[in-house]
Amino acid sequence: AVPLHLIARAEAENWLAARGVAAQNAAKTQNWSGKLGQILCLTEQGLPVRLAIGYGDTTERKRKRFGVVAGLSTMPAQVFDLVESDQDRARDFALAFALGKYRYDRYAANAAPKAELICPEGVDAEKIEAIVSGEFLTRDLVNTPSNDMGPAELEAAARDLAKTYAADISVVTGAELLAQNFPLIQTVGRASPRAPRLIELCWGTAGPRLTLVGKGVCFDTGGLNLKPGASMGLMKKDMGGAAHVLGLAKMIMASNM
């Protein structure tokens, strides 16, 4: 594993001095100053032996919360060992690193290799994984083209989630929406051959009741084009409300809140 250090702008000069002339020369060559997301790669015999990532300053981090990992996309996929004693910095970087690994590769024949991170002790990796898995579920649902993400597919995603976390799920579909007094859902989707539905997922028995509601209008690619052409490409995101609720539900259930 390649040691990886988080170095703020104010720390850069001392950190380089502690590592000697070779590191200082490398920083000059690579124009590295600790700017947020900047990568300094220290090598021996042409191989990376240590990485420093610019942690920037307070202003930079406020402007770009996850900007610290921006430069990692230029690095080959490998295992990094995070060397960081500040727990808050280590946790924030681990979350940014994990979120930065997202790729929508559902239709890819071969998924590209991904970098891995060894976190220092004290970082709650399970919590980070729960957050990231929920985020990735939301992104996958939104990124899936409309022809593969209709009401039935959205229901299937909810059922998979319910099965994984032993949650209860009920679905009201098509004409039954009128019988159960959900006329607006039925009205919006009745012209499509893909029947509209109300999906309800319930989990947990203790604590205050929290209800999350997300609109899941799955765009029908065979419908009439009533919007300006330039806006049609983003219509697959019209079900993003439901995707966000499912992703958040996954975070909550995976964290056993």
Put a short name on every predicted segment.
Residues 1-218, 231, 251-256:
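N-terminal hydrophobic/helix-forming segments and targeting peptides
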Residues 217-225:
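Short acidic, Gly/Ser-rich segments with clustered Asp/Glu that frequently serve as metal-coordination loops
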Residues 224-257:
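Acidic/histidine-rich catalytic neighborhood of metal-dependent amide-processing enzymes
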